[in-house]
């Protein structure tokens, strides 16, 4: 009977030791995971700071280019460059605020569409008016001359 108790107690001690070893391994692996997550957060933080610095530099460069082209007439090529810069600026802003950027793009599209509509209406109205004014001036010049 003593032998059964000795075997049972030794079995309990062995299982308790196995559990403690297993718990130690789990806690070590959890620490490793936590350390890896912390280092990844640090790397992401550094990467985020670098990206924000690059975005700030790009925005500054784009604003400088815009201000140099703003006060003089632009060629078609310069106009295309400015359009591309504006698109880059929108893309950079969309990285910071994706929801607001999509709203701005939609709002910008609607404004462009409305502007095109008004331009078409102006052409339809101004065309005949200018024709009438031109013919009236032509008639006056013929009468005077």
Swiss-Prot record:
Q: Where is it localised? A: Secreted
Q: Which UniProt keywords apply?
A: Amidation, Amphibian defense peptide, Antibiotic, Antimicrobial, Cleavage on pair of basic residues, Cytolysis, Fungicide, Hemolysis, Secreted, Signal
Looking at the keywords, is Cytoplasm present? no
Cross-referenced Pfam families, in alphabetical order? Answer: Bombinin
Modified positions (Isoleucine amide) in chain numbering = 144
Tissues showing expression: Expressed by the skin glands.
* Entry coiled-coil feature ranges: none
Q: Point out the propeptide residues.
A: 19-43, 75-122
- KW Oxidoreductase (keyword) present: no
Q: Name one GO cellular component term.
A: extracellular region
Q: Which InterPro entries match?
A: Bombinin
Q: Could you give a single Gene Ontology term from the biological process aspect?
A: killing of cells of another organism
Q: What is its main location?
A: secreted
Segment forming the signal sequence? 1-18
Functional note: Maximin-3 shows antibacterial activity against both Gram-positive and Gram-negative bacteria. It also shows antimicrobial activity against the fungus C.albicans, but not against A.flavus nor P.uticale. It has little hemolytic activity. It possess a significant cytotoxicity against tumor cell lines. It possess a significant anti-HIV activity. It shows high spermicidal activity.
Q: Which family does it belong to?
A: Belongs to the bombinin family.
Please identify the protein, giving its name as recorded: Maximins 3/H11 type 3
């Amino acid at each position: 009977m003593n032998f059964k108790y000795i075997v049972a107690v030794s079995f309990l001690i062995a299982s308790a030791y196995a559990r403690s070893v297993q718990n130690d391994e789990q806690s070590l692996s959890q620490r490793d995971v936590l350390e890896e997550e912390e280092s990844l957060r640090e790397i992401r933080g550094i990467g985020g700071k670098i990206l924000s610095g690059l975005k700030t530099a790009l925005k500054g460069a784009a604003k400088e280019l815009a201000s140099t082209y703003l006060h003089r007439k632009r060629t078609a090529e310069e106009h295309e460059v400015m359009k591309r810069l504006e698109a880059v600026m929108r893309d950079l802003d969309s990285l910071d605020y994706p929801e607001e950027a999509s709203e701005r793009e939609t709002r910008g599209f609607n404004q462009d569409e409305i502007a095109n509509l008004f331009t078409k209406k102006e052409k339809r109205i101004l065309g005949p008016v200018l024709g009438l004014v031109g013919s009236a001036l032509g008639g006056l010049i013929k009468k005077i001359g």
